[in-house]
């Protein structure tokens, strides 16, 4: 297997699926993905148990096609996981079962699913166009840049995913934005506390015993 060619083909597939289902921006929601799942005949099984290293799995057997998702995942990880499993639907159905955990995360099939998901949620071409429009030159992308980009596009690609993309495309030096921790804190510094988070904190404060 030519890995680079395989990954490039998956990016092309991601673009085709986006176009087929009318996705034209960097914001791909769970609702969008559920709609695609429904058209593809994929059932969703929300698993109530917590897994330390497993977010989802794809099953294709005599009962049909099912994607198991860890219930309660936040919006960004849920969207990425659903897009990840969608790659297995298109390319790996003959395997019967596809899942990603620490034992196989470096295998081409799973890396390919990550490549597909990142391109599906925020295509490289759109990422480049947005950064160019923001006046960000090669090697000059900072954590602040990515916070502004996420705010502008409302993408469901996580900060970690955006950081990987920024370094791979040359907008940030290697091991700079991917090494950054504290995305939510930086987001709050730049844009203020999310009102829902503020309300939740206020409620918790009122509920504390004297």
Label each residue range with its predicted role.
Residues 1-210:
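Active-site hotspot residues in diverse enzymes, especially metal/ion-binding acidic/histidine motifs
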């Amino acid at each position: 297997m030519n890995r680079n060619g395989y990954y490039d083909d998956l990016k092309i597939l991601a673009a085709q699926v986006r176009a087929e289902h009318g996705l034209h921006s960097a914001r791909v929601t769970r609702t969008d993905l559920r709609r695609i799942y429904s058209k593809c005949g994929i059932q969703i099984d929300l698993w109530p148990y917590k897994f330390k290293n497993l977010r989802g799995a794809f099953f294709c057997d005599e009962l049909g096609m099912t994607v198991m998702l860890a219930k309660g995942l936040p919006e960004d990880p849920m969207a990425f996981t659903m897009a990840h499993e969608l790659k297995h639907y298109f390319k790996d159905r003959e395997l019967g079962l596809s899942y990603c955990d620490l034992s196989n995360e470096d295998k081409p099939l799973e890396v390919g699913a990550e490549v597909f998901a990142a391109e599906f949620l925020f295509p490289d071409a759109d990422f480049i166009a947005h950064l160019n429009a923001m006046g960000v030159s090669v090697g000059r992308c900072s954590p602040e840049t990515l916070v502004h980009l996420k705010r502008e596009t409302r993408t469901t690609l996580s900060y970690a995913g955006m950081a990987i993309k920024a370094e791979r495309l040359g907008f940030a030096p290697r091991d700079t934005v991917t090494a950054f921790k504290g995305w939510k804190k930086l987001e709050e510094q730049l844009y203020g506390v999310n009102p829902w988070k503020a309300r939740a904190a206020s409620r918790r404060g009122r509920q504390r015993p004297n």
